[in-house]
């Protein structure tokens, strides 16, 4: 008896209804023309890591908890004297999510984390880059349920970039709206 492979809820919803809705809306003739999610990039810049290397490691640990995948510490490429920054100093961390972990993260972001943001009025509908990708900033990483509020020493912000295969911003907006992204009106 063959076991069925795990399919995230949002991926199943995309295969079942979203893909056909987008095909009708934009009149695609080929299945490969329908936009889909490609990857999600989480980036956390830590300016204080210049003075204390442990802060970059702590931020990478928190980002790993949020993403469910190991985050990599990013290092400076050039020295900038005004920021007291030397070459190869840790300045942040990042992680790229694809496939199953990407769909699970987007599900947690839209349904759990964003509703926990104070004074949340919706996502900015103008944050598309012109090529079908969407970026948003989160001011406090403690809105995610994986982070224990009592054990966090500092609260950091992070950038979330959702990359899609859409050719235009309108196609990407329709795709993300179908995934229940709460855009402002």
Curated annotation (Swiss-Prot):
Could you list this entry's UniProt keywords, alphabetically sorted.
Ribonucleoprotein, Ribosomal protein, RNA-binding, rRNA-binding, tRNA-binding
Cytoplasm keyword on record: no
> Which Pfam families is this protein grouped with?
Ribosomal_L5, Ribosomal_L5_C
Q: Which source organism does the UniProt entry give?
A: Nitrobacter winogradskyi (strain ATCC 25391 / DSM 10237 / CIP 104748 / NCIMB 11846 / Nb-255)
Q: What is the lineage of its organism?
A: Bacteria, Pseudomonadati, Pseudomonadota, Alphaproteobacteria, Hyphomicrobiales
What the entry lists under InterPro entries is as follows: Ribosomal_uL5, Ribosomal_uL5_bac-type, Ribosomal_uL5_C, Ribosomal_uL5_CS, Ribosomal_uL5_dom_sf, Ribosomal_uL5_N
Q: Which GO terms describe its biological process?
A: translation
Q: What is the designated name of this protein?
A: Large ribosomal subunit protein uL5
Job description of the protein: This is one of the proteins that bind and probably mediate the attachment of the 5S RNA into the large ribosomal subunit, where it forms part of the central protuberance. In the 70S ribosome it contacts protein S13 of the 30S subunit (bridge B1b), connecting the 2 subunits; this bridge is implicated in subunit movement. Contacts the P site tRNA; the 5S rRNA and some of its associated proteins might help stabilize positioning of ribosome-bound tRNAs.
This protein's GO cellular component annotations are:
ribonucleoprotein complex; ribosome
Q: Name one GO molecular function term.
A: rRNA binding
Q: How does it assemble?
A: Part of the 50S ribosomal subunit; part of the 5S rRNA/L5/L18/L25 subcomplex. Contacts the 5S rRNA and the P site tRNA. Forms a bridge to the 30S subunit in the 70S ribosome.
Annotated gene: rplE
Similarity-based family? Belongs to the universal ribosomal protein uL5 family.
């Amino acid at each position: 008896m063959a076991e069925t492979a795990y399919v995230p809820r949002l991926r199943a919803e995309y295969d079942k209804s979203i893909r056909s809705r987008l095909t009708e809306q934009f009149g695609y003739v080929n299945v490969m023309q329908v936009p889909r999610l490609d990857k999600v990039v989480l980036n956390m810049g830590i300016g204080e890591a210049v003075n204390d290397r442990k802060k970059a490691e702590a931020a990478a640990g928190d980002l790993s908890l949020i993403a469910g995948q190991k985050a990599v510490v990013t290092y400076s490429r050039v020295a900038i004297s005004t920021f007291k920054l030397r070459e190869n100093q840790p300045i942040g961390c990042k992680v790229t999510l694809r496939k199953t972990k990407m769909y699970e993260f987007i599900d947690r972001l839209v349904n759990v984390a964003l509703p926990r943001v104070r004074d949340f009025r919706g996502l900015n509908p103008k944050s598309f880059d012109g090529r079908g990708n969407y970026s948003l900033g989160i001011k406090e990483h403690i809105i995610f349920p994986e982070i224990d509020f009592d054990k966090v020493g500092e609260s950091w912000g992070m950038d979330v970039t959702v990359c899609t295969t859409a050719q235009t911003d309108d196609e990407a907006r329709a795709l993300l709206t179908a995934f229940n992204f709460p855009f402002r009106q």
